[in-house]
Amino acid sequence: SYHGGLIGVVAAAWGCTRRQGVSLREAADLVVPAAPLGYTFGRIGNFINGELYGRVTASPIGMVFPLAPDRALRHPSQLYEALLEGVALFALLWSLRRRPFPRGAMLALYLVGYGTARFLVEFFREPDAHIGYTWAGLTRGQLLCAGMIAAGLILYRFLRRLPQSPPAGLRSPSPRRA
């Protein structure tokens, strides 16, 4: 559901920025670095609710989740996601935000960073019961994340080929004439 939601957010952002006469690439560069903080709190909420728990483990950090179908110790994968997709990705994007990247590069870097973090965490997360494992022992989430990583790399390569004008900054659009 996250991957579809991301497509919806990008489509809505494209529509809003276009309607307001604002550059989507500049808006993304401003907003995207802070977006991972939302995952941190969302995944902590998943942990508190005992949902989206991890795979069975013998690790000393394993926990029993009341909503799991058994009383086995499981990885607290929600916390792994909060740390990797949330805190670590935020720190990375925030530290890179003022570097001389092409306009819009934050979205490409986000796609690669989130896709990589989620792909790795999926090895510890219990797959959705109605989906299970798909191709080559990977979860659907991992396959979708591989697509995100590829899309991020392609987008970055595309952005590098565009002519780079100095950013105009986000400003109030001029009033439209009737």
Task: List the predicted regions and their residue ranges.
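A feature for loop-to-transmembrane-helix boundaries and adjacent hydrophobic helices
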Residues: 1-178
